[in-house]
Amino acid sequence: MPPWFIARQLSHPTGIVGRIMGWLMNRHNARQNAFVVEQLALAPDDRVLEVGFGGGINLPTLVERTAFVAGVDRSRTMVAAARTRFAAAVRAGRADFREGTVQALPFAAGAFDKACTVNTVYFWPSLEAGFAELARVLRPGGRVVVGFLPKAHMDRLGMPADLFTPRTPEEVIAALEHVGFAGVRVTRPTPRTAWNAVVGER
């Protein structure tokens, strides 16, 4: 498949190909996602938001270990799959999956204790606008964890510049601090790990 097609499906999975892409993303990024969830330091009474949940690899853990999980994804295909897979939790009022973007999160201010996003910042028009929305929906003292491959790695993949905007750790840190997150730090399981998880407190 050409890089532009892969990039388009990564940013907005659609139809049968989108479902396959979701499965591939889950398989390829399993360790990265598990590490991001670990950095959330989940508690049983937490209300958690995941932006761009894609194939939904984190959702079983979030649903099982917290009081409420919300997910926002721009892909109607991924939202429909999550609603079907977690129909019991949705009916019980413990989960809510919506189509949307980080620039306009469909939730009230202070609605969540924790929030995460993995491999989505390449597609955001503005880091500051996205993080400002995450800051808005997090309660004071809440935590955000942002997982991504840094620009130095992404540049080697040759993804189309009109669909991907690679980000440096410094850019992500600066944007989080600009909208009011504190204690912002980069963490990785080992110094040789390619991807980063940036953690900030509201």
Please report, for each region that a protein language model flagged, where it lies by residue.
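A short acidic, Gly/Pro-enriched loop at the edge of an enzyme's catalytic core
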Residues: Q103-K114
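Conserved class I S-adenosyl-L-methionine
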Residues: R143-E171
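Conserved alpha-helix/loop element of class I SAM-dependent methyltransferases that forms part
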Residues: R27-D46
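Class I SAM-dependent methyltransferase SAM/SAH-binding core
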Residues: R47-A104
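A short glycine-rich, Lys/Arg-flanked "PGG" loop and its adjoining helix->strand segment in the class I
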Residues: E128-P140
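A short SAM/SAH-binding and catalytic strip from SAM-dependent methyltransferases
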Residues: K114-L127
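Short glycine-dipeptide loop
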Residues: D45, L138-R143
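Core SAM-dependent methyltransferase catalytic element
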Residues: R188-R202
